[in-house]
Amino acid sequence: MIYLAYIVIAFTAIQLMVALMNVVFKQRLPKSSAQEVLVSILIPARNEENTIEKLLKDLQQQDYQNIEVFVYNDQSSDNTANIVEQYVQKDARFHLINGSALPSDWLGKSRACHELAQHASGSYFLFLDADVRIKGAIIGRTVAMMVKNKLTLLSLFPKQEMQSWGERLTVPLMNYILLTLLPLVFVQKSWFTSHSAANGQ
């Protein structure tokens, strides 16, 4: 039994060290925005009538204006498509893609993201879930980080807004696993793609 305790203590100590490393070497986005390269905002959406309009408003209010926004309507049965269409009619940067039936060899969100990428023409692609909120100069600062560090992939850790007790119990586990088991400073230095991890929001 004592050996089991040693194993648990050792594993916990490793997690603590990884977490401390991630705090100490945490990178923040630059305060200033990058040059105005075209950024493609790609949003897969299925039955998102309660959230999609908030995100579209956020995008319109961004300081970074050189964007194109594609929303993939994945056969929604609610008012998602109509809401997006209102923005398409008013703003030439917004586009709606109505998805077809899912092929048997695809998963829903993966297929939606693939279809979105096929339509995009920006220098950078920013994938967002429909329930995400973005504020301030986040797009420009994100591009500045990628340009400065010559990155091909950048994943952000967003603030998680949790409403129910179920969300409060489960959602933090995602960041817990990443931040205590994955030393991000090594990920940034490693040439192995298998060491990469990204947030799926």
Where are these regions (language model features)?
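Cell-envelope/extracellular polymer assembly enzymes that use nucleotide-activated donors
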Residues: 37-40, 68
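Short, well-formed alpha-helical segments that are part of the catalytic scaffolds
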Residues: 19-30, 48-61
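N-terminal membrane-anchoring/stem segments of glycan-assembly enzymes
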Residues: 1-35, 172, 184
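A conserved hydrophobic helix/loop-capping motif in glycosyltransferases and polysaccharide synthases
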Residues: 40-48, 55, 62, 72, ...
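Acidic donor-binding segment of Leloir-type glycosyltransferases
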Residues: 56-102
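Short aromatic/hydrophobic "clamp" motif used to bind/position activated sugar donors
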Residues: 113, 125
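Long helical/loop segments within the catalytic core of UDP-sugar-dependent glycosyltransferases
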Residues: 98, 102-112, 141, 145-201
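Acidic donor-binding/catalytic loop of UDP-sugar-dependent glycosyltransferases
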Residues: 79, 130-145
